[in-house]
UniProtKB/Swiss-Prot annotation:
<keyword id="KW-1133">Transmembrane helix</keyword>
<comment type="similarity">
    <text>Belongs to the wntless family.</text>
</comment>
<keyword id="KW-0472">Membrane</keyword>
<dbReference type="Pfam" id="PF06664">
    <property type="entry name" value="WLS-like_TM"/>
</dbReference>
<feature type="transmembrane region" description="Helical; Name=3">
    <location>
        <begin position="304"/>
        <end position="324"/>
    </location>
</feature>
<keyword id="KW-0217">Developmental protein</keyword>
<dbReference type="GO" id="GO:0017147">
    <property type="term" value="F:Wnt-protein binding"/>
</dbReference>
<dbReference type="GO" id="GO:0000139">
    <property type="term" value="C:Golgi membrane"/>
</dbReference>
<dbReference type="InterPro" id="IPR047843">
    <property type="entry name" value="WLS-like_TM"/>
</dbReference>
<feature type="transmembrane region" description="Helical; Name=6">
    <location>
        <begin position="432"/>
        <end position="452"/>
    </location>
</feature>
<feature type="topological domain" description="Lumenal">
    <location>
        <begin position="353"/>
        <end position="380"/>
    </location>
</feature>
<keyword id="KW-0732">Signal</keyword>
<feature type="topological domain" description="Cytoplasmic">
    <location>
        <begin position="493"/>
        <end position="541"/>
    </location>
</feature>
<feature type="topological domain" description="Cytoplasmic">
    <location>
        <begin position="325"/>
        <end position="331"/>
    </location>
</feature>
<dbReference type="GO" id="GO:0061355">
    <property type="term" value="P:Wnt protein secretion"/>
</dbReference>
<feature type="topological domain" description="Lumenal">
    <location>
        <begin position="290"/>
        <end position="303"/>
    </location>
</feature>
<feature type="topological domain" description="Lumenal">
    <location>
        <begin position="453"/>
        <end position="471"/>
    </location>
</feature>
Length: 541
């Protein structure tokens, strides 16, 4: 008889393999917790109010908040009123990064959110459901003396969601509203050293532009970028894991091709899972250090989506191949009800991502959540994907229940066997249940560490040792799924250990009648695994 390596491996060897994988798992968490810094850094920026003295030439002039060529500044809007400076001549300028610092390609991306300081005034109150129109421009340069080069310019509208905690009376004038943060900008690469943002709030009373938005005192931005130290650790992990998964994948497929039969469906799915994991691992991000690849965030989302779709499909097919009879097994079309929700949900999330980050490739200030239509469209895609995910897990839970029920039903036949044969089949059942529990543990660890990373301060301090929880989450979970795929391809590769007729029926002390009672008629030595044979007879009956 021949089957998977896990079915011919002794418990001692299986424990050794599990121990080695556990050591690598601990190392993956420690790399993020002890070596890598926090994954991201948030930097607050206060805009500087500049006077655009060159009227009607807004698009040809960049206003710097500081430096040798800084703009003419306004202290506050009272000064603007006293000097009779109109709102259309005021520009909010933000230089990135702060003085004496430089941006780096190791930061990988920049995400900005906006906070408006809006004061209450009786004659300029903030209307309900007010919208603010922003005329925003983004430029870059790589030297303090070079001219600014435009990256993007757009007219964007943001909805204001503000509350006022005091009565709206004369005594409350000057107090600020409590406004929600607004999405402002996202760029998928940091290829330049210096960036400049100019923000205008154009006013047109006839068209109702920026009317009824209250008295905007200041504009604050919070910039979030990936830490360079974390990026280097992340790239190093990808560089190390890529050949590891690639080698085991080649080894796995070579063992399959050496068999005299065609690959079965489960073997193909495991191989496809290895390909999708390799697709994630390949460190193409190294090229982003030298090239301005703004599409890397979108590309990363697509890679992760392919992997998770394959992982969910594998779990369904893994359970199904241990439950279905010979006529239904080994055909992908037999799983259309279970795999269909995965495909629909993945497609919805892909469309949503293209509507958000796909558009941001041309307009980094765009956000699908800023309009009623965009919000409804985004929510529709997310809700459909959520429904598909729920359907998937219902199918998966039902199939897992069916498999365990079938195997439990066959366990009643085990006492009638010889001791050696009974121990053999008990080992097969244990190994199947073991993989199911490991899968559950991996999923649970992913959820637990995600929750912990959200509710903690980002790091734990034990004496002189600081553990970066968020970094440990990223590196640990990333390493865990790599080890999971590695273990699948190693343990479920075809075993070349064959028992002769005398050995299989003599040494194990089993009669031919006993063999026929527990398995279907499989005469080929390269046939399905033993757990398939054991579980499938229940379905046939």
């Amino acid at each position: 008889m021949a089957g998977a390596i896990i079915e011919n491996m002794s418990t001692r060897k299986l424990c050794i393999v599990g121990g080695i994988l556990l050591v690598f798992q601990v190392i993956a968490f420690l790399v993020g917790g002890l070596i890598a810094p926090s994954p991201t850094t948030a930097v607050p920026y206060m805009s500087v109010k500049c006077i655009d003295v060159r009227k009607n030439h807004h698009k040809t002039k960049w206003l710097m908040p500081w430096g040798p060529n800084h703009c003419e500044k306004l202290k506050d809007f009272d000064e603007a009123v006293s000097r009779q400076i109109e709102a259309n001549d005021i520009v909010f300028a933000v230089h990135i990064p702060l003085p004496s610092k430089e941006m780096s390609p190791w930061f990988q991306f920049m995400l900005f959110i906006m906070q408006l300081d809006i004061a209450f005034k009786m004659d300029n109150d903030l209307k309900e459901n007010a919208e603010i129109t922003l005329d925003v421009s983004l430029a870059y340069r790589d030297d303090m003396f070079n001219d600014w080069e435009e990256i993007a310019h757009a007219i964007e509208i943001r909805k204001l969601k503000c509350t006022f905690g005091s009565p709206k009376t004369l005594e409350s004038e000057g107090r600020h509203y409590d406004c929600d943060f607004l999405p402002f900008m996202e760029i998928g690469s940091v290829a330049h050293k210096y960036y400049l943002i100019n923000i205008r709030l154009p006013v047109n009373e006839r068209k109702g532009i920026n009317v009824g938005i209250g008295e905007v005192k200041d504009i604050r931005l919070v910039g979030i970028h990936q830490n360079g130290g974390f990026t280097k650790v992340w790239f190093a992990m990808k560089t190390f894991l890529t050949p590891s998964i690639l080698i085991i994948m080649v080894w796995y497929w070579r063992r399959i091709t050496l068999m005299t039969r065609a690959p079965v469906l489960l073997e193909k799915v495991i191989f496809a899972l290895g390909i999708s994991m390799t697709f994630i691992n390949i460190p193409v991000e190294w090229f982003s250090i030298g090239f301005d690849w703004t599409w890397m965030l979108l590309f990363g989302d697509i890679r992760q989506g392919i992997f998770y779709a394959m992982l969910l499909s594998f779990w369904i097919i893994f359970c199904g191949e241990h439950m279905m009879d010979q006529n239904e097994r080994n055909r992908l079309s037999g799983y259309w009800k279970q795999v269909g929700p995965i495909a629909v949900g993945s497609f919805c999330l892909f469309i949503f991502d293209m509507c958000e980050r796909g558009v941001q490739l041309k307009n980094p200030f765009y956000s699908i959540w800023t309009t009623e239509v965009g919000t409804e469209l985004a929510m529709a895609f997310i809700i459909v994907a959520g429904i598909c995910l729920c359907l998937y897990f219902l199918f998966l839970c039902f199939m897992v229940f069916q498999v365990f029920r079938n195997i439990s039903g066959k366990q009643s036949s085990l006492p009638a066997m010889s001791k050696a044969r009974r121990l053999h089949y008990e080992g097969l059942i244990f190994r199947f249940k073991f993989l199911m529990l490991i899968t559950l543990a991996c999923a649970a660890m992913t959820v637990i560490f995600f929750i912990v990373s959200q509710v903690t301060e980002g790091h734990w301090k034990w004496g002189d040792i600081t553990i970066q929880v968020n970094s440990a989450f990223f590196t640990g979970i990333y390493g865990m799924w790599n080890l999971y795929v590695f273990a699948l391809m190693f343990l479920y590769a075809p075993s070349h250990k064959n028992y002769g007729e005398d050995q299989s029926n003599g040494d194990l002390g089993v009669s031919s009648g006993e063999e026929l009672q527990l398995t279907t008629t499989i005469t080929h030595v390269d046939g399905p695994t033993e757990v398939y044979k054991l579980a499938r007879k229940e379905a046939q009956e």
